[in-house]
Amino acid sequence: MAVIFENPQYVHVLRMLNSMPARDKTFRALQFVAKLLSWHLFYGGSSLSTVNKWKKLESNISFSRKLFSIGKVLDYICKVYFDSLKLQNPLSGNKSALPTISFTKDVAFAGYATAELIGWFNKTELMPCSHSKQISTIGKQCLAVALLSSCLAGCYELQQNSKKIKSATQEASEKDSTSLQTLQKERKEILFFALQNALDATIPLAELDILKVNDGFVAAAGITTSLMSVYKTWIGSY
């Protein structure tokens, strides 16, 4: 047993799973795996009872994850406040669009988290809401806006990064060579999160029937982005 419990990789897994983001994204991955299996089994001709087992698992995991929205609402409200302090005066000479994009993103995320929390209270019947379906739709719209804002921010950061790389490439000093390596590493991070946000954005867009894709694609996108998040948490927990 000591071989298992004292194994560095085992200890690393436990340390990672002790963090809330890692647990949430792991549950999210399982949620979309259940969604993918229910979709595959349905179109594969499996019995309705078998399909419903996986749909029920997906629904239960989704329901339990909504409770995490309590902390997320407070977190995003705090971010919105600090983002508002960074908003630039339109008459100022600063042309950076990031503060405005960040403010829009966090307002939208706050709206989505609030809608999720209301949905949780409604389903538990602690605070029934007669407009739960409309609020759920608004929540999906907020999520789509937030993720598309994140994509826009990624495009803006990529543009700025490209300018810096071009400038650093034109210099031949050792200092600029180190700076270039840092910028190239930063570029990989920007592209990673841009891809993640773009894939995540397809989920609410599909649920709102704006993007015409099947549940299999949505589930695959959800699994991919969840594993991407788990990977980042894994790297960060070393």
From Swiss-Prot:
Q: Where are the transmembrane segments?
A: none
Q: Where in the cell is it found?
A: Mitochondrion; Peroxisome membrane
Q: Which GO terms describe its cellular component?
A: mitochondrion; peroxisomal membrane
- Record membrane topology: Peripheral membrane protein
Q: Name one Pfam family in it.
A: PEX11
Q: Which domain of life is it from?
A: Eukaryota
Q: Which family does it belong to?
A: Belongs to the peroxin-11 family.
Kindly provide the name given to this protein in its UniProt entry. Peroxisomal biogenesis factor 11
